[in-house]
Regions:
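Metal-dependent phosphodiesterase/nuclease catalytic metal-binding core
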Residues: 37, 151-187, 192-215, 223-250
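Active-site neighborhood of phospho(di)ester-bond hydrolases with catalytic His/Asp-centered motifs
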Residues: 46-48, 70-78, 98-101, 160-164, ...
Length: 386
């Protein structure tokens, strides 16, 4: 695929994968592993692909080269879904040099038993690779989301090669009816979300560049309305709510807490609120995490279980904390048969999170819903709708 006259897409689509990174469901739309080739007077290949697709990738490269030979392999990110083809490339093109950060070369030793010492070029923030007619300026992007990561900027065509930044779930040969944001958001908060301050740092560097195209390592090449993507990443990485709305995440066993959640959701919607509800035992938890970060208010609803909270709720709260959840209002709903303590446990779990405002009202379901707990639901709906 031609991106510009001299920059081609040579990546692959994976329709066999069910879980990305062993946990994120991509069974419906698959995954793309992107790679690019820059055809200057000299030729640079940007990144490789996952191990199961190396032969296909090398075939795509051969077609794009049209009889020419690559001079460089540029490694922006060493995660195996982008680096598995390095050894095969270096064997096929013995004259080619390999460029990467020092951290990436250390990882190559771990993965391949060598860092190709006679052929390696260590690059860092601000270094430039002149290809003749095109050049790559390297931008240090540590911890977006691994420590060795580099971005690079091609000045002639104004292209940012953004490693895992601006990526999304889904193969590129399937049109996503929900557009870019939904699966990009799930990808960001699942993969990159913990490292917001590092994303902020690289966005500040990118602000000084005239970017017309963004080439990520997953998902589509971005060519239009780039301000939207940059602004969205700024919102996500600064942990600010993207939209006004309320996410309700619940864990219920016999249905009494679920009934309370349904009444609360209806009460909130009757007050004009946008509400998103997730059963943590049955729904995709990554989507629940996504919406918890998307909206400005969150309701955690859990039964009391062995004096603690239900395991799915514990995992959910732990995942939020692990991804630096902050700057939100959180309300609590608890249930139990004789001595509900879930709200107390959840409150303690939230204490380590930054800038969390607990709602003054809470809902306690003792056994099943009654007039008292329904009144608490109405009071909480009023508070969350102010």
């Amino acid at each position: 695929m031609e991106i510009t006259k001299d920059i081609r897409y040579i990546g692959v689509d994976d329709h066999d994968i069910d879980l990305f990174e062993g946990q994120y469901d991509v069974s419906e739309n698959g995954m793309a592993y992107n790679s690019y080739v820059i055809l200057g007077d000299k030729i640079a290949v940007a990144d490789s692909v996952d191990a199961g697709f190396v032969d296909e990738w090398l075939g795509n490269l051969e077609a794009a080269l049209d009889g020419r030979t690559p001079d460089y392999l540029v490694v922006h990110h060493m995660e195996p879904d982008h680096s598995a083809g390095i050894a095969a490339f270096m064997e096929r093109y013995p004259q080619a040099q390999i460029l990467a950060s020092m951290g990436a070369f250390r990882m190559m030793v771990n993965y391949f038993g060598t860092d190709f010492p006679e052929r390696k070029m260590v690059v860092k923030d601000g270094d430039v690779l002149d290809l003749g007619g095109h050049s790559l300026t390297f931008v240090g992007a540590p911890n977006v989301h691994w420590p060795e990561v580099l971005f690079s900027y091609e000045a002639t065509d104004k292209v940012l090669f953004s490693a895992d930044g601006f990526g999304k779930f889904g193969a590129n040969d399937i049109e996503d009816p929900e557009g870019w944001a939904c699966e990009a958001r799930r990808y960001y908060f699942g993969i990159v979300g913990k490292f917001g301050k590092f994303v902020q740092a690289v966005l500040k560097k990118a602000a000084n560049l005239d970017i017309q195209i963004i080439c990520p390592l997953h998902g589509p090449v971005l060519t239009e309305n780039l301000g939207y993507y940059l602004d969205t990443y700024n919102t996500w990485s600064s942990y600010q709510p993207e939209d006004e709305g309320i996410t309700i995440a619940y864990a219920s066993v016999y249905g009494h807490l679920k009934a309370a959640v349904e009444e609360l959701a209806s009460a909130l919607e009757a007050r004009g609120q946008k509400v998103s509800v997730f059963d943590l035992a049955r729904d995709d938890m990554a989507e629940a995490v996504e919406d918890a970060f998307r909206y400005d208010r969150l309701v955690l609803a859990s039964i009391t279980y062995q004096g603690e909270i239900f395991p799915f709720m514990s995992t959910f709260i732990h995942t939020l904390a692990e991804h630096a959840y902050q700057n939100r209002t959180v309300a609590l709903v608890e249930a139990g048969s004789w001595a509900p303590t879930a709200a107390k446990v959840m409150t303690k779990e939230l204490e380590g999170m930054k800038d969390i405002t607990l709602a003054q009202n809470k809902v306690t379901v003792l056994g099943s819903l009654n007039d008292a707990s329904r009144a608490q639901i109405e009071a909480l709906a009023d508070e969350l709708s102010k």
